[in-house]
């Protein structure tokens, strides 16, 4: 059924495809034509509708009759109508606007008339009253109103005129619209008719679409019926196929069984052959071992021989070196050259030997082929092509010629080489050549290739050559007739001369080139490697009559690059032409030249061909640049153009002619090699060793080393020739002078110039010294093929007539808004008076001034100019680039223009402009809220921005403000900042706003705004300062202070009310407070939070408990840790020395230990620094005791804020905090002196933390602690109570401790459970309290196992042998643990579990039992050692598990239990193993057996009987091939099998822990239901 389901979709798809084809055929029938649909739609429409359609058709006919002119006229009329409508709308808007303005104008006139009447009435009233001033004023108002009235009248008249003109325009527009009203109506009707036509057409289209939809629906139903019929037919066909498949399957199974029987027999036979083959292989391996050992001995002899030769050669080299040094020559250079020559000779001899061997190989192959060919010729004599030389014949002729030429020299070289090299290398060469001859796969393939005929089928036995029938053969002589011979000779001669036919017209023979080519020269320029270039040639027939043309080809050296496409056109008349396509694909960057040869009827001709690479063609546009005459100081420039007309770019560089060029890479490398030759003396040893190695390997060099050998010879010759000139070449190049030259190059001096481009380089002429100036330059290029170009530059420098002797005017340091003056002197050397114009740059004209601005200087005289400088604060912005804002330096260029002189005379004004500002920082001081019981101090800074010192002082200070130090007066240096303290102490609650004024010596005032709020808090403290008595470390001092609420009445006039500034007074009632302690302070305040009622006070206790800083204790503990680690390392190093170095003296050992300690101390210190100390550690406690004894008294001060809030703290809801006001804050100052303690611990290095360590639960540990009274008086002791249910108990105590006396306290620790316990014991005296911290840990046993997953798999073992594996148990507790090992197979309760059903029956997922198959001999298959023992704390115990099976099984298992103290089971380890009879095993597949052995099975212990009884065991592998989607291929079914080999107990050099495993991957593709048998054949070899 699954097959049916998988095939049905495919059948449906096929049916759908057929139906779609039928539908496409039906839809393409004529009945679906649009015309037919249109005719049907017209027939179905009602008569009324048809009449409307007819009317529309008549309208359409009328519209069609309109000419193009009518349409154009209608279009223009529509545009005119739209323009008229737009103009009408605009004019209408404009008219309305004008009418509005006219109404407004009339309203203003009415208003002015009324105002005139009112003013006239007032004038009359004032005249009657006699108020002439008012009358005059009113008359002025009347005149103004009259003028306004006149203006309004004028405006009204103008508005009326504009309105009238607008109305006229409106009338004209309406007249034009009236004229076009008829066209507007006709156009509207036409638009409506067009809309009706479109509606009718839409209705027709709808009808046609509905008809088409009906046909589509009918086609769909037809396709459905066809698909149902097709599915029925496919179902019947599929059912028939299934029946046929079942029948075929039965037949196939019958034949398959027979085939499998034959295969089994064949497998048995192959297995026997395999055993025999393995036996032979083992014998070969044994023989190979013997030969390897013999070869090793031979190789050792050769190596000893080579070492002796190398030593002899080294002695000869040293002797030769001494002789050369005695003669005064360079021994190193001589030896290097000599060794190079020897290397080259050795390589040459090796190369010749190799050529000889290769020649012999080739000759032997050719002789072999010749023999085979002769043999074939005897069998099948060739019928044709006897005189044609084959490739093999050509090769044989070449080899024979080569042998004749090189036989004698080769023998001499061979003899010389054998005499010089000795027997060692020759033997190696023989071995290498024999290996090459025997193992070269290319030789066999070549032999096979050469053994085949050139034409397939010639050597086939069934091939018969073609024979001409006897009736077709004429009776002719063997050599042909005489006429045939003459014709043949003439034809051959004509073909050799390549003249086919001489052309003679009118008795005139054509002489010359038969075809002309256009172009005459085919030139491929500037080509790139890899690209393809194509060009066409036109060949024109220049002969007298018809001619032919044939392509012969290109020359030999062009055939790899040039391809000619030429289709012979046939006969060409005179003057006709044909085209030839030439394709050029360059593969080397090289110029090529040649010809393309053609053959015409009258002779041969060729077209020249040229291929040019990219080249540089560089030139300068001029070789001389003449600047002419210029005044000294002026600057001018010219440009020179470098042009590249070639197709290759390069790098250029413009240099002065005197500057040397940079050396190329090759030259630098040559110089470097020469330097190394003369200076690097250490290279001698490297060269000697490399020569000795290369001398041994020289016999194995190949032909590829010939090129490098020739290059080395050339290099040696060049060095020998250039050795005298070498010191000149290695001289240091002096850099060009840094002085300014008059003719220089511009910014662009080097760069890249591309192909077919040009670059302009500027040349700058700046005359400095009068006189003629000239310079030479050169242009160098990186491309060595480009020559260096040279050009020359000349110019003349002329001196100026006017100059300034002081070109720089220094005004020193100037302040803003201060006037500074100076005079500038101008000289002239001219013999005539000159007009001078003094000019200041426009940026500085507001700050600098030169007086006068214009003047005349007499001949050969001087002229003085006044300079005025008044810097303003806008100078940095105005000056721009002339002023440096960082350094405040002004460099102002001044210009003196001289008549008839191009270059002006300039001088510079230098000044350092600084400000006189003093800056107070911050700009505003806010003291905030300050109570009347305190003073607030804040710091301000005064910064001098000037570069000059200034005196200052704070003046007119308020009474409640003070400035310190020196009461705010002093002198501030340039750019200095002074710090001042401003102290503010209010006397009453109000807001304060005031200014601090700082006045400088130049009477400039700088003000600082200050503000503050005086606060009268509702609470006050009894005293604001507490001085504690001297308190010992880790002791406590307590002081009391009262918080008072003195606010009793809201209406008391004599007392000030609590308030914040000028706010309302605080409400009377309960007031709460809270003290905020600073972090990490030794202060404790109780209560820190409280409420005080009006007229009441609250007592507060302040406790002071000083302790040592944590950081200081850790610093003190670090040396102790370092010392302890050094002691441990010293003991560790001394232990082996005492055993091994008894004979050495004590001083030697001490020196060695000191060195070792010094080396080890550094890492230990770093390790201890990284280690984190705990307060309970011994080092920490010892360091604290040391610091306590050495503690020096100290004094600290703390300020504790107390915040105040209105209300009772009890009234708050839950944990809701009160709204404390930050302004009503009181401050309490504490003075805290600290001294050393009076009672200290003398035992345990003075530590106060005592750790009893790890104590087993139920055990008891006791410690004794000694305390001492270090004070000068006796002290009474009192002890705090310990937890009565806790593990700590104080066993003794005393009530008095004498001065300097010591007492021992005895403490015990008895844990009842595994916990970490800690308590404190306080020893109380009148001078302080000593606190002892007691710690201890109750420990339970705990171990860990090294086996992960609690499963130990012993793997596969050959039955009868054993294998061992180990694991470790580690004691992680701090106590020794007693352990014992138990196996479940040896347990007494094992028999109870065997009475139940087997595991594979009750639980299919878990097939095996915990205790699996056991040995048949009664011994346990698993054993463990040791069985019992004790593990020390932190130690590891090794255990060995031995697996010894006596028969084959895959289900050996057992469970190992680790029991502690014979009670507690700590770990359970599952032991597994498998045993096989053979060394090979296979894992994987489906199980075919059960994990429980049958009791009826009788083991076979005899190997001979076992082999007879043994059968092949099948492995069931089930592969599920699932295909989810028919469209996509499903992934192959995959199962993995592992084939392994078991190591035997035979001794071997290396024995790995796990067997060799090989995975066999089985894949199944396709729909396969048969069962296959896969046989694994493997070979067991002895491996390392």
UniProtKB/Swiss-Prot annotation:
Residues 692-706 have a biased composition (Polar residues). It is found in: Cytoplasm, Cytoskeleton, Cilium axoneme; Cytoplasm, Cytoskeleton, Flagellum axoneme. GO terms for cellular component: axoneme; cytoplasm; nucleus; sperm flagellum. Pfam families: Ig-CFAP74_2 (PF24770), Ig-CFAP74_3rd (PF24778), Ig-CFAP74_4th (PF24798), Ig_CFAP74_1st (PF24771). Residues 692-739 are annotated as: Disordered. Residues 300-379 form a coiled coil. It is linked to Ciliary dyskinesia, primary, 49, without situs inversus: A form of primary ciliary dyskinesia, a disorder characterized by abnormalities of motile cilia. Respiratory infections leading to chronic inflammation and bronchiectasis are recurrent, due to defects in the respiratory cilia. CILD49 is an autosomal recessive form without situs abnormalities. Affected males also show infertility due to defective flagellar morphology and function. As part of the central apparatus of the cilium axoneme may play a role in cilium movement. May play an important role in sperm architecture and function. Belongs to the CFAP74 family. This is Cilia- and flagella-associated protein 74. The gene is CFAP74.
